[in-house]
UniProtKB/Swiss-Prot annotation:
Reaction equations catalysed: S-adenosyl-L-methionine + a thiopurine = S-adenosyl-L-homocysteine + a thiopurine S-methylether
EC number of this enzyme: 2.1.1.67
Residues reported to bind S-adenosyl-L-methionine: 29-40, 69, 90, 152
PANTHER family, sorted: THIOPURINE S-METHYLTRANSFERASE
Protein name: Thiopurine S-methyltransferase
Pfam families for this protein: TPMT
Subunit description: Monomer.
Subcellular location: Cytoplasm
Main location: cytoplasm
């Protein structure tokens, strides 16, 4: 694993299993949206993505970009406005509808025949498609392959016991020459049960190391007042670029 030079020294807990059996149900995630408990949403978009956008896109045009557990991420419109094709998956129909409304985008919706009860929401422009379903059901649908994956708030939200299955799905969606940008969080997992869950460097290497080159682009202190209620006194965000070996 190639590591970025940084002044931030992050304590790692590679052997901890304190969050190993932690499980959040899909209904609990839906309830977070209904109750407005979406502190993970960033209205101004992700600053590290903005900073490293050129590294991510590599000057290429008309890319297919995948957003796992997309919520109402404003970055989806950024990419669509630049001519890229955006596909996302999100369990909360409310989150998807709020995205289209807040971005002032007209859209249509239709059932996903392969997944009972699931829907796909498509922008009228045709370059944003958001699937409202369980991410782990997504392999039943042929959504094609992707040039780029922007994984922020996804791996850290997946129940720890499901990470291997999640990673297998993500890598199955990649095209040759893909670039996968991954944001994870480091904090003391003995003090906060998650989500967002703690993902140590060793776990990233274990999940992606056999198929991907792993490069840490940056580490930033993202501690805010609201994090005090989690019982932690530091939280660091790490941005990784994963590329094909």
């Amino acid at each position: 694993m190639d590591d970025a030079s940084t002044l931030i020294d992050v304590k790692e807990y590679p052997g901890t299993e304190v969050q190993k059996n932690r499980v959040l149900t899909l209904e609990e995630w839906r309830e977070k949206w209904v109750d407005g408990k979406i502190g993970f949403h960033q209205e101004q978009g992700h600053q590290l993505l903005k900073k490293h956008l050129d590294t991510f896109l590599k000057g290429e045009n008309v890319l297919r970009v995948f957003f796992p557990l997309c919520g109402k991420a404003v970055e989806m419109k950024w990419f669509a406005d630049r001519g890229h094709c955006v596909v996302g998956v999100e369990i909360s129909e409310l989150g998807i509808r709020e995205f289209f409304i807040e971005q002032n985008l007209s859209y249509s919706e239709e059932p996903i025949m392969e997944i009972p009860g699931a829907k796909v929401f498509k922008s009228s422009s045709g370059n944003i498609s958001l699937y409202c379903c369980n991410l782990f059901d997504l392999p039943r649908v042929n959504i094609g392959k992707f040039d780029r994956i922007w994984d922020r708030g996804a791996l850290v939200a997946v129940n720890p016991g499901d990470r291997k299955c999640y990673t297998d799905i993500m890598l199955s969606l990649t095209r040759k020459g893909f670039r996968y940008l991954l944001a994870v969080l480091s904090y003391d997992p003995t003090k906060h049960p998650g989500p967002p869950f703690y993902v140590p460097d060793a776990e990233i290497k274990n999940l992606f190391g056999s198929t991907c080159n792993i490069h840490c682009l940056e580490k930033v202190d993202v501690f805010e007042e609201r994090h005090k209620s989690w019982g932690i006194d530091y939280i660091v965000e790490k941005l990784y670029l994963l590329t094909e070996k």
